[in-house]
Amino acid sequence: MSTGNFDLNELKRRMQGATQALKHELGGLRTGRASASMVEPVQVEAYGSHMPLNQLATVSVPEPRLLSVQVWDRSMVKAVEKAIVDSNLGLSPATEGQVIRLRIPELNQERRKELVKVAHKYAEQARVAVRHVRRDGLDTLKKLEKNHEMSEDDQERLAGDVQKATDSVISEIDQLLAAKEKEILTV
């Protein structure tokens, strides 16, 4: 019973990568109090590539509803400001020299609904990533079976295992989304 070069654990690890990315993105959708992690997902167009904000500035929380972004390179202030505005976090930057202040607005019902939509978008991106991994795995299984490196029975059994892993990770994504949606909508 040979399974060729097929590693189900590697496929599961890649699927979990999508879940980890989703957790990171959902962590940026904060409600209520200011947190430096709110701006973690912000990518800045800098030095010819996209860079995370935390590689260009120091983010601090001087007050419960205020973030302070100290940009290290004066020439990057406008790029950081633009990235924050474009990030769909609903934050309006106020710049003073190399410091960008971000007031965290009280969340009204409309803004909560916008945040839920953003969370749904992130979750759908994660689901699509998981489905791509599933497709890669199933394609690999078909090739192994076609090249007689695996029996048809083994291919079908492993395809079922791939589907079970996919269903499990998609279910985890749905649970993460439901928890974040509840957190956002709780007044």
Swiss-Prot record:
GO BP, sorted A to Z: cytoplasmic translational termination
Single GO MF annotation: ribosomal large subunit binding
Family matches, as InterPro entries: Ribosome_recyc_fac, Ribosome_recyc_fac_dom, RRF_sf
Protein's UniProt keywords contain Heme: no
PANTHER family hit by this protein: MITOCHONDRIAL RIBOSOME RECYCLING FACTOR PSEUDO 1, RIBOSOME RECYCLING FACTOR
Name of this chain's protein: Ribosome-recycling factor
Function comment: Responsible for the release of ribosomes from messenger RNA at the termination of protein biosynthesis. May increase the efficiency of translation by recycling ribosomes from one round of translation to another.
Cellular component GO terms, alphabetical: cytosol
Keyword Glycoprotein: no
Subcellular location(s) per record: Cytoplasm
